[in-house]
Amino acid sequence: MPKAVKVSREEELLRNAILLFSRGGFRETSLQEIADELGITRPLFYYYFESKEDLLWRIIGHLGDTLLEQARPIAVADEPPTRRLTRLFERHAETLLENVDAFRIYFAERNQLSGKRDLRLKRGERLYHELITEVIVEGQRLGEIRPGDPHLATRLAMGTANSLLRWFTPAVAISAQELMSATVEYMLAGLTAKS
């Protein structure tokens, strides 16, 4: 019999907040609604989170770091650039599809962060895009990737992958794995040089 995984109260609150924000939006959801939905009082809310923005940060702040940490070893692997791009895009799509609600909140509400949190998020996004762009540049140099603006290619590829969040649900007639494979195939087909 599998052991029950013990979830901390804080993790439970974060999971519930993800569902709440994905349904109603961050700005539109009041602190009282959050407390009511989480089954806590407003004073208890402040025991776990400094502010509503802190709650948002706890939900989305780590997502960019996760993508970057997963991408670094793939980007420098001893493989052809097209193979590394395939693996990078697969990992990106897989991570999005494993965390659909949290990433929907990330893309819809990231502009609600201020100060150091906003700067950290933007820095992580920039580093992630630079990492992918470097692989595209290497692929262009070797003739594997078509010539053109590598920054634009990165933005278009990431935009394609991120657009999955706008319409994918588990009820779609295609599995997450099939969707990820098809998306990566189309993304790479758009980047690779014609033989």
Which functions belong to the PLM regions below?
Residues 12, 20-54, 58:
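Helix-turn-helix
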Residues 1-8, 195:
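N-terminal intrinsically disordered/low-complexity leader segments
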Residues 9, 13-21, 92, 187:
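Short hydrophobic clusters on alpha-helical segments that form packing/core surfaces
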Residues 65-69, 115-141, 151-155, 178:
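Amphipathic alpha-helical packing segments from all-alpha helical-bundle domains
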Residues 84, 97-116, 166, 170:
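Amphipathic alpha-helical segments used for helix-helix packing
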Residues 58, 72-101, 153-157:
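Hydrophobic alpha-helical connector segments
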Residues 62, 73, 91, 101-105, ...:
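Short, solvent-exposed amphipathic helices
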Residues 91-94, 98, 129-141, 160, ...:
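C-terminal peripheral helix-coil segments that are non-catalytic and often amphipathic
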